[in-house]
Design a protein with these regions (language model features):
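Active-site proximal loop and beta-alpha junction motif in alpha/beta enzyme cores
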Residues: 1-219
Length: 219
């Protein structure tokens, strides 16, 4: 079996919740596209990442069904695990930092593909949504919990044809998109209780950050 770390990314303050992320630290153990996609499908996490060069931060991101050029929660998790300041997913250079509690990456909203946000009138409406709601395409449902404070309640629904992931527990890329649309810093509670923080930059970039913890390690 491949050496595999499983992380929880965007944990709550008490360390609970967070979105599971599979990390294969030595990408050479899955050298081709087919073996990587098969392992990502077998694990069934929102994303599994293969590290091709840990010093340079070269990584390959997979959902159970496809390869991704960019994704938020995998890169936040990897920045924490590898303790490096720059990552190299297919989209290009992504800068990272750690402030002692939260790990942050800096991204551009145009890197976020095939997602849309939808505002609801109340937190209760968001929490009452079935998983997934009717329709097709990636939906980030959200409502203000406290608009003055920038606190948001959100849920994420991939609504992909394969139906493997009914609801995403914490979605960094969707949080980036919402932050760009609102042009303000946000404190997002997503899913069962995961926490995502964001901050827009003057140059159009968005910082997204959260807590990361080990869930399991397999060898």
């Amino acid at each position: 079996m491949n050496d595999l770390d499983v992380l929880r990314v965007f944990c709550a303050g008490d360390g609970r919740y967070g979105n599971l992320l599979g990390v294969v630290r030595d990408g050479r153990t899955c050298p081709d596209d087919a073996s990587r996609q098969a392992l990502a499908a077998e694990l069934g996490y929102s994303e599994t990442v293969f590290v091709d060069d840990p010093e340079r931060g070269v990584v390959d991101i997979r959902t159970p069904g496809t390869r991704m050029s960019f994704a938020g929660h995998p890169l936040v998790g990897l920045a924490w695990l590898l303790d490096i300041e720059e990552l190299q997913p297919p989209v290009g250079s992504v800068w990272a930092r750690d402030d002692g509690e939260f790990t942050w990456i800096t991204a551009r909203p145009e890197w976020v593909e095939d997602k849309r946000t939808c505002q609801y009138e109340s937190v209760a409406e968001v929490e009452a949504l079935p998983a997934p709601p009717p329709g097709e395409g990636w939906l980030y449902a959200w409502a203000w919990e406290d608009e003055a404070a920038g606190r948001v309640r959100a849920r994420g629904f991939p609504r992909r044809p394969d139906g493997v992931i009914a609801e995403d527990e914490a979605t960094g890329s969707a949080a980036i998109l919402l932050t760009a649309e609102l042009n303000r810093a946000l404190n997002i509670t997503q899913g069962a209780g995961s926490q995502i923080l964001t901050a827009p930059g003057a140059d159009g970039t968005i910082e997204v950050g959260g807590r990361v913890r080990f869930a399991q390690t397999f060898q």
